[in-house]
Structure formats: C-alpha cells, structure tokens
Amino acid sequence: MTKLPKCVKLVFDTRLTRNQKRRKNNMRKKYSHLKEMIEDCAVKYENNIAFKVKKTGENGKISYDEITYARFAKEIEYLARSFIETGLAGKRIAVIGKNSYEWIVVFLAAVFAGGVIVPLDRGLLDFEIADQLKRSEAVALFYGAEFKDRVADYDIVKVCTEDKEFSDMLVQGKEADNKKEYDSIKISTHDMTVLLFTSGTTSASKAVMLCQNNITFDMYAMSIWENFYETDVNMALLPFHHTFGMMQTMLFLSCGMCNVFCEGLRIAKCMNEYGVTIFVGVPRIIEEMMLAVNKKITAQGKTKKIQTAIKLSNALKKCGIDVRRKMFKQIIDGMGGKLRMVIIGAAAASPDVLKFFNSIGVLAIQGYGLTETSPVISAENHSHRRKDSVGLTIPGIEARIDNPDENGIGEIVTKGENMMLGYYKEPELTAEVIKDGWFYTGDLGRIDKDGYIYICGRKKNVIVLSNGKNVYPEEIETIINLSPAIKECIVYAEGDDIRCKIVADEEFEGDANESIAQHMSYVNEQLIYYKRINSYTVQDTEMAKTTTGKIKR
C-alpha cells in the first residue's frame, strides 16, 4: 500500500482529533438510532439534569422542575407505551407548539413507538396547518395550549401537552402491561422517521423525509467537530420544528448537558437565571444582543475605551495571552456571566456580530446546511474559522462546486449520510436534486484551496444581466446591511437596473436618510460596475419573512 505523505497525515489528524484531545470525555459514540442514544444517556448521565423547567403555581409561586436523564428516558417510554395502548404506535403523529419539554417527549415517543413524527411550524396560518396535516397523513396532533381553539375542528386525535390528558397518558403507559411489546419494536435506522416541511408558502413547501441515521450521523459529526461538555447549559431558543433546532437539541442531549427554555424575549434574564453557557439562535436575535450591549457602552461613554481594550486583547492573544474574558467580564456578566459559545443558525450572520462576540471571549460560530441535509453541511469551530466563510465540511461530509464560473462560483453539491431520503411522494422533484448520490443544494458559492465554503446566494435568486454577467443579491445585501442605520434590505432587478428596498432602523440616533445615502455611495464604490445599485427606496415597514426570519423575495 502506498504511504501517504506525512503532511497529508498531519492535516487529517488535526481535522478529526484535535477536539477529541481537548475533551474530557474524548470518545463520542455514533449511535444507530435515537432510542439507543437516550437509553445510553439515561445510564451514563443518570442523575444529570436533562431539562430544567420553570413552573408557576396557582398562587404565583415560582418553582423549578429538574428532570434527570433517567426520568426523561422513562417518560418517553411511558408515552410510547401509551401510544401502543391507544393504537397510535407506528402511526404518524404531528406536534406543534412553543419549545417545551413535552414537545421533545412527544417527538421521541412517536419515534420509539415505531412511528413517524411530523413537527409543524408554530408560525403557520390555520389553513397551512390543515394542509400539512393532510399532506403528512398524520392521525394525531399534540399541541401547545395556544393552539387549543385553532385545532378544535380537526377530525384527528388531539392532545394538549399542557392539559391533564397528557399527564394521564404517561400514567397509562407506566401502568400498561406492554413492556415486552415496547421492547420488541424494531427501530429502523434507514426508514423515514421524521417528516419536515421546508419553510415557504404552502404550495412551495416540500415535505422532507429524514431517517434516524441522518440525524445521528449529523449529531456525531458535530460532537467531534466542536467541544461540548455535560457541564454546559443550553438555552433552547431555536424552534424545535426547525431542523437545526431539533438536531442541536439531540446533539446536546447526547453530550449530557442541561437544557432550559426562555420565556418570551427576556433572553438576558433567562441567561442569568440559568447560567447559560451555550446559546443557539437566529442572526437577528444574536444581533439584538450585541446592539443592546453596544447601546449601554455608548450611554456610559465607554465606546473608545472598549475599542482600545479590544485592540489590546487581540494583540495579546496573538502573543498567546488570552485575557478577553477577564478584560470584558462586565459585558459577559450582562449576559449571565457564563456564556462561552454562541451558535448562529437558520441564516447567515453579520461579520460584525461574529467579530464582536469573538473579541470579548465568547466563541461565535456559524455553519451552513439545509433541511434536506439534516441540516449541517459545514461549520466553523474554535480552531477553524475564516472571514466571510461558513467553515469547513464537518467530518464525513463531502462538498464540491458544480459547473464553476471564472470566479470559481457555482452550485454547491454535497454527499454524506446526512442527506435526506427524498421529498415525500414527489419522486420527480427528488430526482432533480439528488443525482448520482450527490445533493444539489440550490445555493451558489465557492470553496477555497483550504476547503472553506463561501455562500454567494440562492441559485434561483441570481440576477442574469443582458451582458451575461451574474449578480448575487445576497452578496450585495451583506455589504448594505453593515450600516447601523439600516435594519434590513432586499436587492432586486428591473431589467438591467439593480435596485434595493431598505428598511431604516428606527433606533438609529441621527439622520438615518443622510447616513443611508452616504453608505450607499460607499457600497457602490466597493462594487464592480455591473453590480452597482442604480436606485433605492427607504421604507418604515419590515419585509415579509418566513418563520425562520428569512426575507420572502
């Protein structure tokens, strides 16, 4: 056998083992299915707190329900055995509602009972809920209390996860004489287990079929790509119905950490209350955290002082001296005092946001993926970050650029065990995106010589001018959104004229229109002639968005 050059071996070893050497528990396990994972965690992390849930009594008294991994595993089993008793085992069960402990129990119980779970977006309109229930062929719906009136007329089994009926099902399963039947349920690793609808209008949403191997593979790859500890506390803010929200929760459970929920938008209060160490959120929420900190700094007249401190700490870090968390302790204390990592999902993050958190000693990373890839394809980690990129492919994933242009930009295609089974009952649509074992993402990007991926935008959004030149709207929007006077924008074309709609930030202090005008002149100076903005309009109303916060084009 031909020996690999030493330099190649070194690169390979660094990619796959650096995180493991730093981790106390350095042997992560690749689980065959989720039941194996939960049962293993119930033993390994038996008395660890899996979920800490705030409860408000009738007298207004606050208490906390600390649910251990052992209890969590038992309650999943009890609900799954209740499904056997009620004829729901092996069936399709939908769940809708805010992030909650009960939501996760329903999700896993449906899977453990040999069925298919159908997570529904809680931002859907009534007719969209009805449509997706019909398309998924769900026979039961578990819902949060806020949906009680909205789902009352649906002719399927309905259970409110916040009513006594749900807790009665746990008791029913516990007392049922069907333990052997439950234990004998065969868990398939490669059959459809999760049916997820992509965001968009009802007519455009696609039902994505995922198997357990898709999820456990992505979990495992992420667990060896970044450092996660059983002592971590995760604030589960990203919606569970979103693939990344679902996968990262399963990932964090596999690592034995504690998971907590945020009430409303009181993020800073919750982070302080629970001692949150890891926070996963959409870009807008992370950006608002940064803006809130900057607003306090400005009000205290400390802007120049902080900027100088950041320059000093960055210089020291280059010399191997990291004093960021000590130097910016007051800022970190304002976010609970223990925050060590911010993970940004669902959309691309502003470079300013990533730079801010990393400058104060909180690791801020982002990745790239789709519902169809369970979802992570690439990600940054503590030692692999590069400006404007979405990181390297996570272990076990391949990616390449299809039909690149003169700038190396083309469609990103990927291959790995995280790739979906297909679109439910849409074989022709599936064949359009899965070819010869490769998934065609519909995203345009490039990959540099070191393997870092850079996203330019969606293939369907690209503007092709009459001279044959391509303009990528998202690329220009990233530059435009750097202005503090601009909240959001959308770039589009009318003929060969590149235009832009801008939403001004109402909290901007100063003349927003003048600031925007100056910034747009700067933007055009940075762009090649055919990409320049010919005209723009400023509006007060926000753009229409999907439930994951992406602007609808």
Language-model segment annotations:
Residues T216-V233, F240-F328, K338, L363:
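Conserved AMP-binding/adenylation subdomain of ANL enzymes
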Residues L141, G416, L421-G422, L444-Y529:
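AMP-binding/adenylate-forming catalytic core of the ANL superfamily
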Residues F279, V323, M327-I453, K459-V462, ...:
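Conserved AMP-binding/adenylate-forming
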Residues K61, E146-T189, V293-Q330, D540:
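ANL superfamily adenylate-forming
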Residues E46-I49, A176-F197, A204, N227-V233:
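Conserved pre-ATP/AMP-binding loop-to-beta segment of ANL
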Residues E66-A70, T193-M219:
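Conserved AMP-binding A3 loop
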Residues K30, N47-S100, I104-L108, L125-A130, ...:
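Conserved AMP-binding/adenylate-forming core of the ANL superfamily
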Residues E488-I490, S521-R553:
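Conserved C-terminal "lid"/linker of ANL adenylate-forming enzymes
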